[in-house]
């Protein structure tokens, strides 16, 4: 949880409902404690909380002496507790802080819903403001429709809560929302409180500690859990809100295929410094994501099939449904013959083995179960031969795996994903490896599938048992489920009334399959000749003479296939599909169809669209369901180590047809969207627009937002790993050492190789395990392609050769994959399938060098042409906020990032390249964190041109997207912030004097910061002694090691996350403010105070930076930091350093107050100030206990009881500070 969800500048918020929720949850926790730990221990906890509350209140009122006295008394009492008392006390305070955090998130959602005026960051408010300021509505519509924001979820180790606890927290938030209802009866309210009591008790009785380090697969499952838990519901709500605001202010609805928001992931793809992320893991995670996507879509399709029961449809949908039926007949007849022939052959063999006469059986076997002259089907012949043959034939007619449509059922537990993700060593196409843990191909979701034929009424479905379903499914009989049962309850010959008389359904089906007769007609389903379809389909009789219809069938057909168009192609690419035509504004098309419908007589309409007794949408969606089930089964095969069945690709999605035979799996979102779009426009054509704009539209929006993999996976690796791989190649080929070449030599050789067409790496080249892993990663990337993967990010980019090296390794891998596949699928280097390569600039020196690196890249002939041909003249660059801050301090890093963005914008514009900046921000201010709208709107002008990528890390993912209502607000805030930064970019520094002052501030702050952090010989020892940095390794909060490959114990090799995390624990939070006070004081000494105050008021970049520092300073507590030093630091010189740091903190606070003009910290934001003061009485006791536990643990490092107590205290402080790393 984080404070950044609260708007800076908010004057006042009524916190009474929040305080009521906190009291309710606190009282429930108290009731639980009385039962769990006893009245005596509970009273001791109450006493300690009361002491902490009094000390905090006195401190707020300015009575420092009395507050210090109470704090000292509190510390003495806490440090004398034994562990049997300290652990429940720490747990109680930690749970209270977590519960209050849940209440705060819920209060934010409640506040937005209750206000009469729209949230100033809402779509409605921002659109209205832009129109008022003179923005043309058409320009606004285009900007929103073409906007592309992507949030990339990462698994950086800052989420201390187990996923089990996160789920319970989400459940409590949902119950609080229900508790707010004013229409609850007294009994219902009591029941609601009882539900809350049960959840709180379950929290207390659940172990809050991870007992083993999470794997990358565990982290990936956590990311997928967020999608299922909240984003799946939040995205369509957000799209509806966005479309409604657009319609209100521009007169246009949001295009159906627009994707203003997408999600990416690093979970399972970020291998920078994490040896646990391998090529196998990456392949496994992508299969897991596609399994989850297919499963979620299956649930929606099941519900849609129940809802879309109407029998009116457009010509396009009717054509699609007929093709599905026809191919289902062919498939089913083949199954009948095969089963009957096998059974008859077995009967004849058995009879012969017993010496009996088998002439009739042999004859029947020779006939192969074909239809006989008197109309008896193969099933009838089988019955004459024996019961086994009859049963085999009957199975083929009665089997239907689609089942009865039914309303939405509760979501399956996300643990089903966990079952599928275990193990190592499974087969992957092309010889890659996934895992070996066996998994049934029939998951729990599939076991519950009902069984009714898609063309029948819900009430009259055909039922069968699950074993029969399994037998037919194992036989690959997917096509048999696509059509209604034509033969009634019997599989033999039967006559059914149709629109044109009677037909023997079994006979007609078998004859049609043989090609000897026209294919059968669906009972009671009129059709008409379609000159554009194959002869076999055109033979279907029609109920009336074909002729012109009052509807534009050609236009509707175009609408039904619009999903396959637009930028992005097969994988949905990154671009939106809202450019023009039917893929753009749907408003005109809807109005036109409604006008045509109202202008057509009911008789004409019925003749053209009604199909009595037939359910075309269920037929089409049934086929969609089969393909989704096949997709899910294929992923199960990959995840469990089985070789996937080699089904041919094609069907409805391929070519816009309506059949599909074996119902292959889905590869791209456009394939899945095509039949859904056809159904959508068919409903509008038939007067059912209000139906189309319900669940079906929500599903279409989800398809284009989540695709077939939910979140595309980025790959990330350090630049030196690529250089080492190429060094192994050049050394083996006798070309010298790549690592020893100059930058010019590297660029020259890389360009020459990329311009050529020959393979570079010999197949039999010996290599180390590290080099093999790098090459295997590129091979997996070549297999997975852009349908599954997003960008390839190069961390620690130093030169243009780092980017060119990745391009060469990508091309080499695709050539190898193409050769292994025998040339199938276009695996060559010219197929445009390479991932976009994204350099990441992190340190202060790298940020300064970014301009030269990108200039050299964009002026390289090969790279420039590659960028144009493959990536549409678009370049993405990532900026690192974490390492730059650790390297130079927050203020110097912020200014370097700002200038870097300005230069990158100028370079790309000069080269006619569209730039997307990818911001690698963390949760805390020390790592670039802060409120979303402030962060985006303080970027340099021109750096946000409708595209924006950003990471959300660790605890921030749950805080911003874990609850559906909060996620909805976040999505809207991202959208409007990017829109404002695009259409009303923030102003640059208005005077050159401001730049000069910023340069001075940056220089002084960097020098002050580095003199302490990097140049003081005492600092590293003080850091290790005064914080729990060393002990953080025992907290299993991430799969990645805390340090990079270099083993030396220095600040430079320490990851930015534990660096921030450790300082947050002792409440000094040094990385976020160190150096800033010295810089501001130096500027004010030179007479720049008025300039600083003007910069704060008028320059968004500087103002937001100062506001964030002020918020961090309000969270610091030098008294707590002094306690850590007093108890844990023994060296007098280190203690002097600690005293100097606290003195610098005080000076920084004074300097910030002078610049802002505030009387006290956060006096301009009383809401946030109040929230921080509400937490202090619970955080302070945990800090004091942590100090004592650290002291004891360092004397007895193997004491597991002390370790547990320390980890519980770390969790509790993280909950109270609302951010960790």
Swiss-Prot record:
GO molecular function: phosphoenolpyruvate carboxylase activity
SUPFAM superfamilies: Phosphoenolpyruvate/pyruvate domain
Entry EC number(s): 4.1.1.31
Necessary cofactors: Mg(2+)
Enzyme superclass (EC): lyase
Ranges annotated as biased composition (Gly residues): 565-575, 648-661
Coiled-coil segments: none
Ranges for region Disordered: 443-588, 642-661
Protease recorded as keyword: no
PROSITE patterns: PEPCASE_1, PEPCASE_2
GO cellular component terms listed in the entry, alphabetical order: cytoplasm
Catalytic activity annotation: oxaloacetate + phosphate = phosphoenolpyruvate + hydrogencarbonate
Active-site residues per Swiss-Prot or TrEMBL entry: 156, 886
Transmembrane helix as UniProt keyword: no
Entry keyword set: Allosteric enzyme, Carbon dioxide fixation, Cytoplasm, Lyase, Magnesium, Pyruvate
Gene Ontology BP, a term: carbon fixation
Subcellular location(s) per record: Cytoplasm
Regions of compositional bias (Low complexity) in chain numbering: 503-513, 550-564
Its biological purpose: Through the carboxylation of phosphoenolpyruvate (PEP) it forms oxaloacetate, a four-carbon dicarboxylic acid source for the tricarboxylic acid cycle.
Family: Belongs to the PEPCase type 1 family.
Protein name: Phosphoenolpyruvate carboxylase 2
Species per Swiss-Prot/TrEMBL record: Chlamydomonas reinhardtii
Lineage: Eukaryota, Viridiplantae, Chlorophyta, core chlorophytes, Chlorophyceae
């Amino acid at each position: 949880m984080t404070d950044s969800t609260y708007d800076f500048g908010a004057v006042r918020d009524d916190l009474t409902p929040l305080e009521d929720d906190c009291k309710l949850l606190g009282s429930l926790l108290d009731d639980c404690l009385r039962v769990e730990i006893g009245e005596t221990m509970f009273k001791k906890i109450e006493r300690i909380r009361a002491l902490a509350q009094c000390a905090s209140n006195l401190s707020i009122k300015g009575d420092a002496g009395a507050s210090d006295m109470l704090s000292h008394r509190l510390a003495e009492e806490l440090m004398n507790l034994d562990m049997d008392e300290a652990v429940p006390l720490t747990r109680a305070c930690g749970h209270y802080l977590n519960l209050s955090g849940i209440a705060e998130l819920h209060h934010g959602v409640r506040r937005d819903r209750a206000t009469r005026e729209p949230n100033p960051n809402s779509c409605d408010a921002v659109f209205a403001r832009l129109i008022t300021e003179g923005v043309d509505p058409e320009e606004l519509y285009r900007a929103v429709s073409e906007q592309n924001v992507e949030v990339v979820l990462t698994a950086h180790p800052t989420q201390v809560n187990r996923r089990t606890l996160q789920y319970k927290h989400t459940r409590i938030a949902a119950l609080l929302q229900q508790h707010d209802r004013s229409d609850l009866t007294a009994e219902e309210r009591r029941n609601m409180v009882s539900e809350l009591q049960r959840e709180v008790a379950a929290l207390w009785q659940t172990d809050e500690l991870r007992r083993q380090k999470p794997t990358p697969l565990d982290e990936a499952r956590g990311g997928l859990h967020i999608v299922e838990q909240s984003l799946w519901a939040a995205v369509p709500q957000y799209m509806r809100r966005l479309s409604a605001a657009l319609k209100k202010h521009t007169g246009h609805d949001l295009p159906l295929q627009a994707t203003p928001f997408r999600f990416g992931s690093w979970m399972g793809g970020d291998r920078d410094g994490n040896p646990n992320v391998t090529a196998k893991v990456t392949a496994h995670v992508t299969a897991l994501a596609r399994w989850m996507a297919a499963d979620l879509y299956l649930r929606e399709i099941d519900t849609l099939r129940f809802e879309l029961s109407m029998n009116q449809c457009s010509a396009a949908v009717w054509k699609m449904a007929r093709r599905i039926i026809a191919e289902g007949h062919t498939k089913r007849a083949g199954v009948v013959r095969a089963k009957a022939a096998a059974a008859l052959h077995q009967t004849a063999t058995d009879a012969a083995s017993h010496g009996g006469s088998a002439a009739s059986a042999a004859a029947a076997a020779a006939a192969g179960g074909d239809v006989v002259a008197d109309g008896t089907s193969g099933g009838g012949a089988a019955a004459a031969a024996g019961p086994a043959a009859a049963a085999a034939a009957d199975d083929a007619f009665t089997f239907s795996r689609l089942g009865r449509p039914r309303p939405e059922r509760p979501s399956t537990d996300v643990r089903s994903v966990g079952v599928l993700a275990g193990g190592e060593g499974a087969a992957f196409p092309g010889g890659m490896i996934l895992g070996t843990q066996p998994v049934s191909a029939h998951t729990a979701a599939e076991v519950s599938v009902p069984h009714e034929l898609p063309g029948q009424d819900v009430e009259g479905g055909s039922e069968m048992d699950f074993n029969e379903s399994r037998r037919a499914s194992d036989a690959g009989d997917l096509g048999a489920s696509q059509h209604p049962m034509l033969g009634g309850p019997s599989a033999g010959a039967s006559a059914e009334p149709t629109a044109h008389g009677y037909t023997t359904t079994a006979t007609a089906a078998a004859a049609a399959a043989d090609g000897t007769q026209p294919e059968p007609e669906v009972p009671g389903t009129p059709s008409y000749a379609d000159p554009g379809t194959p002869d076999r389909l055109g033979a279907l009789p029609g109920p009336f003479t074909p002729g012109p219809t009052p509807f534009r069938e050609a236009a509707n057909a175009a609408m039904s296939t619009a999903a396959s168009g637009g930028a992005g192609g097969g994988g949905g690419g990154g671009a939106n599909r809202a450019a023009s035509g039917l893929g753009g504004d749907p408003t005109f098309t809807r109005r036109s169809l409604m006008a045509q419908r109202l202008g057509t007589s009911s008789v004409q309409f019925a003749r053209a669209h009604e199909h009595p007794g037939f359910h075309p949408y269920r037929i089409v969606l049934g086929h969609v369901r089969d393909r989704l089930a096949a997709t899910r089964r294929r992923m199960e095969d990959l995840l469990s180590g089985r070789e996937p069945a080699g089904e041919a690709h094609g069907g409805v999605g391929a070519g816009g047809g309506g059949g599909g035979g074996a119902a292959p799996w889905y590869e791209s979102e456009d394939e899945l969207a095509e039949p859904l779009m056809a159904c959508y426009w068919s409903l509008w054509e038939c007067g059912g627009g209000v139906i189309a704009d319900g669940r079906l539209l929500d599903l279409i929006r989800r398809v284009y937002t989540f695709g077939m993999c939910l979140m595309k996976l980025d790959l990330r690796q350090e630049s030196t790993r690529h250089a080492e791989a190429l060094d192994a190649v050049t050394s083996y080929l006798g070309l010298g050492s790549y690592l020893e070449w100059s930058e010019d030599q590297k660029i020259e050789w890389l360009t020459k190789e990329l311009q050529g067409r020959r393979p570079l790496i010999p197949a039999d080249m010996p290599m180390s395990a590290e080099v093999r892993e790098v090459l295997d990663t590129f091979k997996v990337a070549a297999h997975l392609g852009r349908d599954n993967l997003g960008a390839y990010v190069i961390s620690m980019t130093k030169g243009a050769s780092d980017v060119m090296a990745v391009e060469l390794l990508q091309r080499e891998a695709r050539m190898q994959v193409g050769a292994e596949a025998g040339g199938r699928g276009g695996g060559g280097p010219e197929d445009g399938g390479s991932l976009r390569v994204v350099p990441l600039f992190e340190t202060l020196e790298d940020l300064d060098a970014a301009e030269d690196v990108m200039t050299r890249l964009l002026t390289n002939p090969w790279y420039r042409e590659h960028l144009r041909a493959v990536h549409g003249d678009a370049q993405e660059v990532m900026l690192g906020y974490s390492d730059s801050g650790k390297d130079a301090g927050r203020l110097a890093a912020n200014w370097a990032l700002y200038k870097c963005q300005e230069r990158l914008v100028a370079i790309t514009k000069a080269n006619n390249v569209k730039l997307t900046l990818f911001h690698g921000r963390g949760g805390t201010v020390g790592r670039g964190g802060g409120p979303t709208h402030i962060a985006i709107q303080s970027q340099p002008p021109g750096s946000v041109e409708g595209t924006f990528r950003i990471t959300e890390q660790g605890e921030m993912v749950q805080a911003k997207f874990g609850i559906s209502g909060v996620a909805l607000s976040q999505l809207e805030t991202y959208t409007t912030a990017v829109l404002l930064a695009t259409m009303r970019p923030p102003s640059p520094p208005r005077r050159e004097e401001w730049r000069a002052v910023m340069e001075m501030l940056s220089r002084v702050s960097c020098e002050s910061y580095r003199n302490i952090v990097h140049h003081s010989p005492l600092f590293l020892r003080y850091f290790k002694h005064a914080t729990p940095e060393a002990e953080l390794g025992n907290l299993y909060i991430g799969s990645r090691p805390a340090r990079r490959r270099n083993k030396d114990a220095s600040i430079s090799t320490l990851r930015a996350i534990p660096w921030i995390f450790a300082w947050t624990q002792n409440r000094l939070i040094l990385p976020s403010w160190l150096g800033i006070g010295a810089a501001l004081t130096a500027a004010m000494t030179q007479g720049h105070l008025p300039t600083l105050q003007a910069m704060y008021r008028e320059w968004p970049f500087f103002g937001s930076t100062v506001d964030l520092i002020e918020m961090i300073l309000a969270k610091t507590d030098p008294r707590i930091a002094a306690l850590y030093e007093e108890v844990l630091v023994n060296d007098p010189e280190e203690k002097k350093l600690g005293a100097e740091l606290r003195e610098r903190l005080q000076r920084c606070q004074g300097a910030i107050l002078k610049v802002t003009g505030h009387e006290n910290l956060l006096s301009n934001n009383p809401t946030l100030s109040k929230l921080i003061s509400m937490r202090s009485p619970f955080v302070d006791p945990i800090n004091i206990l942590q100090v004592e536990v650290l002291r004891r643990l360092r004397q007895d490092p193997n004491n597991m009881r002390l370790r547990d107590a320390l980890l519980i205290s770390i969790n509790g402080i993280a909950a109270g500070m609302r951010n960790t790393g």
